[in-house]
Curated annotation (Swiss-Prot):
<keyword id="KW-0204">Cytolysis</keyword>
<keyword id="KW-0442">Lipid degradation</keyword>
<comment type="similarity">
    <text>Belongs to the arthropod phospholipase D family. Class II subfamily.</text>
</comment>
<keyword id="KW-0964">Secreted</keyword>
<feature type="binding site">
    <location>
        <position position="85"/>
    </location>
    <ligand>
        <name>Mg(2+)</name>
    </ligand>
</feature>
<dbReference type="GO" id="GO:0090729">
    <property type="term" value="F:toxin activity"/>
</dbReference>
<dbReference type="GO" id="GO:0008081">
    <property type="term" value="F:phosphoric diester hydrolase activity"/>
</dbReference>
<feature type="binding site">
    <location>
        <position position="27"/>
    </location>
    <ligand>
        <name>Mg(2+)</name>
    </ligand>
</feature>
<comment type="function">
    <text>Dermonecrotic toxins cleave the phosphodiester linkage between the phosphate and headgroup of certain phospholipids (sphingolipid and lysolipid substrates), forming an alcohol (often choline) and a cyclic phosphate. This toxin acts on sphingomyelin (SM). It may also act on ceramide phosphoethanolamine (CPE), lysophosphatidylcholine (LPC) and lysophosphatidylethanolamine (LPE), but not on lysophosphatidylserine (LPS), and lysophosphatidylglycerol (LPG). It acts by transphosphatidylation, releasing exclusively cyclic phosphate products as second products.</text>
</comment>
<keyword id="KW-0443">Lipid metabolism</keyword>
<dbReference type="Pfam" id="PF13653">
    <property type="entry name" value="GDPD_2"/>
</dbReference>
<keyword id="KW-1061">Dermonecrotic toxin</keyword>
<dbReference type="GO" id="GO:0005576">
    <property type="term" value="C:extracellular region"/>
</dbReference>
<dbReference type="GO" id="GO:0016042">
    <property type="term" value="P:lipid catabolic process"/>
</dbReference>
<keyword id="KW-0460">Magnesium</keyword>
<protein>
    <recommendedName>
        <fullName>Dermonecrotic toxin LapSicTox-alphaIB1ai</fullName>
        <ecNumber>4.6.1.-</ecNumber>
    </recommendedName>
</protein>
<keyword id="KW-1015">Disulfide bond</keyword>
Length: 273
């Protein structure tokens, strides 16, 4: 999965997919009542990234729905996964469940079209703080009470705080999560980060007792760091330059081993070689 980073304006969806992304990451900010409000990152952000683009969250969802609904004039067949980077740092811990409920209702109405031929992309809820695990339970409760528990089949999870792998496993246990787990690891592209924790995550993914289904690394903009991440065995790379990742995947060393994921590749299944 080539994951376009900080795609917060509807116009950027076309831009990133046309550069080779089959997945996008979108920032979601919340108001003081835990309503998802804007798709907005804000400063500071990555070196060379554009961090001031934004939309109202529900408007962004409508644009995203068009981009992922077959038959729509804006449809991109390649766009199969969306990571919502949930900026829950502005919330009190006891608001996490409410944030999850409100997020689910927004998605149900504006993205899934109330379960009636809505957008088809898989969705990852990426949460920066393990203490906010109730966002997941609130999300699930809301979809169930709205009569659409089947949409949870399209939803996966990520804790993005680079926490100890054992602590992450524990948070999932508390949230009642037993699958659909992506594990991110990374740092802003302005800084260097080793691949030690990525290797631990990959080892967990590949062990029979692990909780992780997919591992992605962020934010990678250079060819050599792309090669290093692929050599470590990641499933996804988040980038400001999807074309760079696509180029490296075309190199002979990687062409035989990796391919770009399509809609038929289940993002919740661990890839077995």
């Amino acid at each position: 999965w080539i994951m376009g980073h900080m795609v917060n304006a509807i116009a950027q969806i076309d831009e990133f997919v046309n550069l080779g992304a089959n997945s996008i990451e979108t920032d979601v900010s919340f108001d003081s009542s835990a309503n998802p409000e804007y798709t907005y990152h804000g400063v500071p952000c990555d070196c060379g990234g554009t961090c001031t683009k934004w939309e109202h969250f529900n408007e962004f969802l409508k644009g995203l729905r068009k981009a992922t609904t077959p038959g729509d004039s804006k449809y991109h067949e390649k766009l199969v996964l969306v990571v919502f980077d949930l900026k829950t740092g502005s919330l009190y811990d006891n608001q996490a469940s409410d944030a999850g409920k409100k997020l689910a209702k927004s998605l149900l109405q504006n993205y899934w079209n109330n379960g009636n031929n809505g957008g088809r992309a898989y969705i990852v809820l990426s949460i920066p703080n393990l203490a906010h695990y109730k966002l997941i339970t609130g999300f699930k409760e809301a979809l169930t009470s709205e009569g659409h528990p089947e949409l949870m089949d399209k939803v996966g999870y990520d804790f993005s705080g680079n926490d100890d792998i054992g602590d992450v496993a524990n948070a999932y246990k508390k949230a009642g999560v037993t699958g659909h787990v992506w594990q991110s690891d990374g740092i802003t592209n302005c800084l260097l980060r080793g691949l030690d924790r990525v290797r631990k995550a990959v080892a967990n993914r590949d062990s029979s007792s692990g909780y992780i289904n997919k591992v992605y690394y962020w934010t990678v903009d250079k060819r050599q760091s792309t090669r290093d991440a692929l050599d470590a065995g990641v499933d996804g790379i988040m980038t400001n330059y999807p074309d760079v990742i696509a180029d490296v995947l075309n190199e002979s060393a990687y062409k035989a081993k990796f391919r770009i994921a399509s809609y038929d590749d289940n993002p919740w299944e661990t890839f077995k070689n």
